[in-house]
């Protein structure tokens, strides 16, 4: 498939979050063993970062021009992290929520930045044992990032539906395709961004939040999509972490295509007010994933029709380099990670396994998916 991944004009980056598990029982560890973080920094360099819990880490990519570059980097990074983890008696798991871990066991990272976060958000932060996929797409300085954001925003529930990988919480079926996003909803400034028409309005809003003590720094605005505070990008934050790297690459390509379409549109046509159906579509994606019913252009459509509409809207220039992403997403419509986890769990229970052994087997299968090749040569 690599021959389909032609170069595209929009550069991008991907951040993936991982749980650290005890290799013996596949539950989260309270703390990483001594030397593990240092070994990760030696191996992954500036692309490795600690997270808010000691049982989590992040891999942040360099800047990419093609999905093939992203596949190579993240495929190697996943392999290196997995091998390092095994050297220390751990396993690394990329998924929205751990199927059976108890969030009460997770130990917060004592670093000052994270300590302030737990002080400010209390139990909301303590409960947020989740992993996400973040995608940055570069926005040229000639374009207003908030205007582009408002144009892309109505499509984001579709990307959540395709990424959903968190149907379990604490050993139980949550009833949601993305329980992670339900937990995100407990935080301030982590759901749908306000209808700010341009970056001037955005900067004024941030200044107000800082001056009134609502935030300590600009990075504490965690909307499902936001202008980055440190690089000239739009950052997609709505998606669950993807067990299969190919799924993550597909979502990155779709987001890049939608941003490319927004950049090529007549600026006068950029919407300044949110679609009235956005919140309903967000709920449908969070609850049902690709089985949801979505309100688009005055009618109810399935995720497959909505994906086709999104792709048809994109001009050829926006599609360039992202064709494989769309083709792969069409396959995700058949079964997302959330749907696959539920199907496998149901199969194991029907075969006579008790709840915990079935969930442990599910984690084993997710670990196998984490290391599947992203693209066929």
UniProtKB/Swiss-Prot annotation:
Catalytic activity: L-cysteine + L-glutamate + ATP = gamma-L-glutamyl-L-cysteine + ADP + phosphate + H(+)
Class of the enzyme per the UniProt entry, highest EC level: ligase
Highest taxon listed in the record's lineage: Bacteria
Gene Ontology MF, one: ATP binding
Keywords attached to this entry: ATP-binding, Ligase, Nucleotide-binding
Keyword Ligase: yes
A GO biological-process term: modified amino acid biosynthetic process
InterPro entries according to UniProt: GCL_type2/YbdK_subfam, GCS2, Gln_synth/guanido_kin_cat_dom, YbdK
EC number: 6.3.2.2
UniProt key word Ubl conjugation: no
HAMAP family: Glu_cys_ligase_2
Family stated for the protein in its record: Belongs to the glutamate--cysteine ligase type 2 family. YbdK subfamily.
Function: ATP-dependent carboxylate-amine ligase which exhibits weak glutamate--cysteine ligase activity.
Protein name in UniProt: Putative glutamate--cysteine ligase 2
Species of provenance: Pseudomonas aeruginosa (strain ATCC 15692 / DSM 22644 / CIP 104116 / JCM 14847 / LMG 12228 / 1C / PRS 101 / PAO1)
Lineage, uppermost ranks: Bacteria, Pseudomonadati, Pseudomonadota, Gammaproteobacteria, Pseudomonadales
